[in-house]
Amino acid sequence: AKSGRASCKKCGDNIAKESLGLAIMVQSPMFDGKVPHWHHYSCFWKRARVLSQGDIYGYTELRWEDQEMIKKAIETGGAAAGAGGDSKGGKGEMTLNDFAAEYAKSNRSACKGCEQKIEKGQIRISKKSVDVERPQLGMIDRWYHPDCFVSSREELDFLPSYSASQLKGFTILSAEDKDSLKKKLPAVKNEGKRKADEVDGHSAATKKKIKKEKEKESKLEKLLKEQTELIWHIKDELKKVCSTNDLKELLIANKQQVPSGETNIVDRVSDGMAFGALLPCEECSGQFVFKGDAYYCTGDLSAWTKCVAKTQTPNRKDWVTPKEFHEIPYLKKFKFKRHDRAFPPCAAPTPISPPAAPEPKPTVEETFPEGKPLTNTKVLLIGKLSKNKDEVKTLIEGLGGKVAGSAHKANLCISTNKEVKKMSKKMEEVKAANVRVVSDDFLKEVESGKSVQELLSQFGISSWGAEIKQEAVQPTEKQPSSGPVAGKSSGKVKEEKGSNKSEKKMKLTVKGGAAIDPDSELEDSCHVLETGGKIFSATLGLVDITRGTNSYYKLQLIEHDRDSRYWVFRSWGRVGTVIGSKKLEEMSSKEDAIEHFLNLYQDKTGNAWHSPNFTKYPKKFYPLEIDYGQEEDVVKKLSVGAGTKSKLAKPVQELIKLIFDVESMKKAMVEFEIDLQKMPLGKLSKRQIQSAYSILSQVQQAVSESLSEARLLDLSNQFYTLIPHDFGMKKPPLLNNLEYIQAKVQMLDNLLDIEVAYSLLRGGADDGEKDPIDVKYEKIKTDIKVVAKDSEESRIICDYVKNTHADTHNAYDLEVLEIFKIDREGEYQRYKPFKQLHNRQLLWHGSRTTNFAGILSQGLRIAPPEAPVTGYMFGKGIYFADMVSKSANYCHAMPGSPIGLILLGEVALGNMHELKAASQITKLPKGKHSVKGLGRTAPDPSATVQLDGVDVPLGKGTSANISDTSLLYNEYIVYDIAQVNLKYLLKLKFNYKGGMMW
């Protein structure tokens, strides 16, 4: 302990200066970071669980005797013997403080293994661990049935040397229950003796090898002991004879950075005197610092990302002691002798991030193997399956998936028809969570290599089930289908949000040009100060994937509506959680308030408030361009009394309501992991979205060229800072594969369309004479008429829907609710030159309902130049299909929201460049007007009819006699927006059969 001021979090007494204290690092509720909870050495083991010395940050920098003491405690499972421990479980045994046995006090607890109730009075065994979503609670009991605990013994870290009699509370059990537990949880015989027996049975060569290994271990331990004693001898002498300023001068003389804190300064000087002065990092010229398992660079690769260089053999030069220090006898006598630093086996280098500070149980972020059929799929198992659950779990993990513990964490359930009919409580939870259920035959077929998406439909046994999305897209359907920029799916499994996620809905009160943060509690009587056209409000972001931080900082200067009173309000925390705090300061004058605001902004960003060009600095925040132009109440007008005065046909009114549905927009943004608290709907500027596109292009290039992970870190930090994401307590994922990049491109596509819809919703005030629906209808500048159900064109279009539903898309049937004839203002004039082109077809194009305000008002668009080309099978263009269900999949309907919209457009295809595999088209070959991706199945060409002089390929799907193509169905792509004339919009109902296929 550096001082005697810290108090133990277990017993409350002070921890004496220079005594050994151990801390558990927990998430601070006040800011986006962790804080140490210090404990006396003896108290620590009653609360924490340590598996190896490497789990304790700073272990190798302790005195040798302290290292040995900790090592022994870890070997005994952190057990406490005698004083400070629980009762002894048996002769010479120590009680394990993080494992306990008792009789259940009620029937409310559930087993963490099988998830069934533990009945009152039954024996239950607990393993103490930290709840990753509520780490501030410390170690909490996770209860198991005895048999479930036994089956999970290894993964629960109940070591072979442990026995049931060491469980806390074992002594109060009945004799019968003690005997039962002893049989179920026996200790493995003495490892040392067993190893000796094994050695005796080995050949002479093996014995010699084992002997050499032991000698090597012994030699390393001796070296580590000598090294530690040398370092501590230097430290002790320096503390006696040198002032802090002397030590700083020594560091400067050896061209080493001077850290803050006396202890850190002593550590740096002693390291240099023992091993040599460290040379700068070759990557960034930063300072290397010893941190337990290696030397880590503390410099920055860029303004966005810290350097990730680490090594156990850094370059050094001899340590020099300037002559002016020869007045100090110890330094005068000191003769530098170069040593190479030795590292213990438990301190092997770990990837990228520095070693974690001591935590009771390290939490590993869930990862999925790439390129496997069940990658990103979390599977819940219910009921008695054809194989035992351990075998099924192994099979699922082999296919790239993970077994989930509960319905709300799963996106697929494997069970039986019997369980579905029985509708147990667990199955009710599955239904409530809208998780699709399949039989275990599904796994056998997946293992054989068949298409996952088709099998999901084939083996579905529930009448419910939400869309299952995977990052890895199936090869035959990898290409974008029919979206304005090649389909607009999030392409990302929806992660479960932590319990720390903020659920409150913020009501933003806009006065003048900005919304007052409601956390200030001044919104009713105040406004944000605006002077010289500059609004004194800033929202800042900072993401550091290496550290796992995802922080925000909000700053406002607030002025009273009537009085001359001023406040500076600031709030900070972790995006998407309730972690954070705030501060409201009343200032004595306007001038003082402005000065304080400017100083805070400069401190957090490194930039002057009035600076025209912002420069990002390392470890500093970056401003988000957020436009609080209108109150949300203006947007809500559409739903209040809408339609009462409308002159539009009822079906058209319902269509306008559907495409301007604010709740659907919010749901889409949540699905994309967008943080609605820090980035309210429609508030992020178009320029910032375009900047994010540009970053994704750079990410794509970096991935394609296999550039360093440090470069990907840098770009990922930039992207997540520009577009605030809600990852809860999870670490922001690295943008390191093309599928995830494409998912983020599609997210930005949708954000742009939502931004268009929202700007139409809130743009311009009406006089109150017109119905809100009519006002929005006029803004999309599209003539929309209802097509009569008994008309010829309705019959043709309905046949087109019925006949071109693909066999593999059999999870749902499509029901045509309405057909609208549409005429976008100015589109026909733009299309007119292509009207004379041959080969004009009426083709399908599907998209989310939230995108249709943008599509109708601005037309189908091609991906912007800033967007990366990844994910577009045939380059950036507008994609169409001749099979309705291929495009319908891109409507992103689901059982809980079964209504979708799909377009029929007249497309001037002309001479088609026919392809069977992906090709990044940037310029069509001479004489070609479009691209056709050849599919294995296509509408029967003999059944094609004409509608207003345009071919309608409404024949039933039949084999195209093309076997060497990577596409299941045809794709049509044009690269000039003028080649498209939108003709019809269909409102469809997706009638799901037994689940959903994507």
From Swiss-Prot:
Cite the residue spans of the region called Automodification domain: 357-507
> What positions does the domain PARP catalytic occupy?
771-997
Domain WGR spans what residues? 525-621
Q: Indicate which residues the UniProt annotation says bind Zn(2+) 2.
A: C111, C114, H145, C148
User: Which positions does UniProt annotate for Zn(2+) 1 binding?
Assistant: C8, C11, H40, C43
Q: Which UniProt keywords apply?
A: ADP-ribosylation, Allosteric enzyme, Chromosome, Cytoplasm, DNA damage, DNA repair, DNA-binding, Glycosyltransferase, Immunity, Innate immunity, Isopeptide bond, Metal-binding, NAD, Nucleotidyltransferase, Nucleus, Repeat, Transcription, Transcription regulation, Transferase, Zinc, Zinc-finger
- BRCT domain location: 369-460
Q: How is it modified after translation?
A: Poly-ADP-ribosylated on serine, glutamate and aspartate residues by autocatalysis. Auto-ADP-ribosylation on serine takes place following interaction with HPF1. Auto poly-ADP-ribosylation on serine residues promotes its dissociation from chromatin.
Question: What subcellular compartments does it reside in?
Answer: Chromosome; Nucleus; Nucleus, Nucleolus; Cytoplasm, Cytosol
The protein's matches in SUPFAM superfamilies, at most eight in alphabetical order, are given as: ADP-ribosylation (SSF56399), BRCT domain (SSF52113), Domain of poly(ADP-ribose) polymerase (SSF47587), Glucocorticoid receptor-like (DNA-binding domain) (SSF57716), WGR domain-like (SSF142921)
Composition bias of kind Basic and acidic residues appears in 190-201, 492-506
Which superkingdom, per the lineage? Answer: Eukaryota
Q: What is its EC number?
A: 2.4.2.30, 2.4.2.-
Question: In the UniProt record, which is one GO cellular component term?
Answer: nuclear replication fork
Binding-site residues, Zn(2+) 3: C281, C284, C297, C307
Provide the active-site residues from the annotation.
E971
Q: Where is the PARP alpha-helical domain?
A: 645-762
Q: How is its activity regulated?
A: ADP-ribosyltransferase activity is regulated via an allosteric activation mechanism. In absence of activation signal, parp1 is autoinhibited by the PARP alpha-helical domain (also named HD region), which prevents effective NAD(+)-binding. Activity is highly stimulated by signals, such as DNA strand breaks. Binding to damaged DNA unfolds the PARP alpha-helical domain, relieving autoinhibition.
Family membership:
Belongs to the ARTD/PARP family.
Tell me the subunit arrangement: Homodimer; PARP-type zinc-fingers from separate parp1 molecules form a dimer module that specifically recognizes DNA strand breaks.
Q: What is this protein called?
A: Poly [ADP-ribose] polymerase 1
The uppermost taxa in this organism's lineage are: Eukaryota, Metazoa, Chordata, Craniata, Vertebrata
Give the encoding gene's name.
parp1
